[in-house]
Amino acid sequence: MALSRWLEQARAMLGAPGLRAIDVDASRWRDVAQDVAAAGGRLLALWGGRTRDTDRKVVMLVLLPDGALVVTLALDRALERVPGIEDVFPSATRMQRALYDLTGIRTTDPDTRPWLRHAAWPAEAFPLTTRELPTPPSRPIDDYAFVRVEGDGVHEIPVGPVHAGIIEPGHFRFSIVGEKVLRLEQRLGYVHKGIERRFTELPILAGHRLAARVSGDSAVAFAWAYCQALEGMSAVRVPPRAAWLRALALELERCANHLGDLGALGNDAGFAFGLSQFMRLKEGWLRATERALDQRYLLDFVVPGGTSADLQADGASTLSQAVRTLEPEVRKLREIYEEHAGVRDRFLATGTVAPELAARLGLVGLAGRASAQAFDLRVDLPCEPYASLEVTKCVHDAGDVLARVTVRFDELLASLRLVETILRGLPPGDHAAVVHAPAEGSSGIGLVEGWRGPVAVALEAGPDGGIRRCHPHDPSWNNWPVLEHAVIGNIVPDFPLINKSFNLSYSGQDL
């Protein structure tokens, strides 16, 4: 059945623009996935929950060339396992494993190893299905069955979960011959915090604060996606000024992260000068953000109905001056990076993900655009005010560290121009509207292009102004598996550089 047949049956869904939804039974679950893949679509997120106290469901959110589709499978009590889609969308494997860890819903995926459960609860307990928190088991931590690579001269290097430096934990198991990487297998989930369960304990009008803390470097993106879903469910139209202020905050966040990454990438290539210069620029950018909007990282700037504060004339002047100061310095540092033979040698042809592989694995966001995956929600599924702005889609086709650095430079400069455009075109009016709790059972999904890639928040209203279910999705879910492929054939000392060129979130993945 062609994708068009499914779309003809689909209904509009609340939240992000371009969203459609369809309900299917188990016999058609894989058919939809296969038709989406054949049409050039890709899986963004997969999660499970309850439609009522006893009924269970599984949901997948797929991105299409001209929209997004939410596919819901209500589970028949007689259905023992949901048909797996890991052969259609390889990124589904970890999502399906997490689905079982949290809800007890098993798929036919042959990989049944735990993903988020690190012996914090018994194997037979599922945190999203009971009111009481499961008791931690008294038995030792489960052994995790890494895939073994055997052969002459092959040995393993375990790295982590505790790393040097101030970063979150993750385990990397390298199988190597000499210094050459034959295989990398990741073990994540060490910072699982029970975020999805915590959402169900909060009022729906306060959930945006937790959403902003799913992955702290993407606070604006997650808070906006949450509020976008909530506002759609509540039939609230955000004032134009509020929408423009949100876009301003999102681009400020994008610039700050790109500045930090470009410095760190220089450092990982042995160019400490790059780190010191970009950290200086990032600090100046954060200080300007704080002077203009009273927060460095804008954790609580986006609120239901708009923003928590307005931008005053002196704040706009501060940001405009920051752009004029920053842009020429970024251009000069770009020249230095491009002309430095040692840096270029480390970046070029390192950690390559060919466009064909990127498409097959579902690489998204900045890393995807560096491998010719030309999708950007700000252009392809724009919410206001992006539909009114001329957003440059920055794409490269080499797929190596150099390409990911190039896309960062391009996006940084493009975002600086966007900030100036927003400051000049900021409409008058209110910066927030009143939002009331939506009716029980209503649902919506927010979609926002964060600096790392597409951020999604699926929200369902519960009784008495509460939350029945909330699933926040970080693009790191899609991109962590691709990193395992990017390092194959490279040498072990290049892994920190390759890893940083993706700069994926542990917290956003681990929930």
What are these regions (language model features)?
Residues G274-F278, A288-V435, E440-G441:
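Intrinsically disordered, low-complexity regulatory segments
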Residues M1-K180, V343-R346, T350-V353, A359-L361, ...:
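Terminal low-complexity/charged segments
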Residues Q96, Y100, A223-E231, A249, ...:
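Predominant activation on well-ordered alpha-helical scaffold segments within soluble catalytic domains
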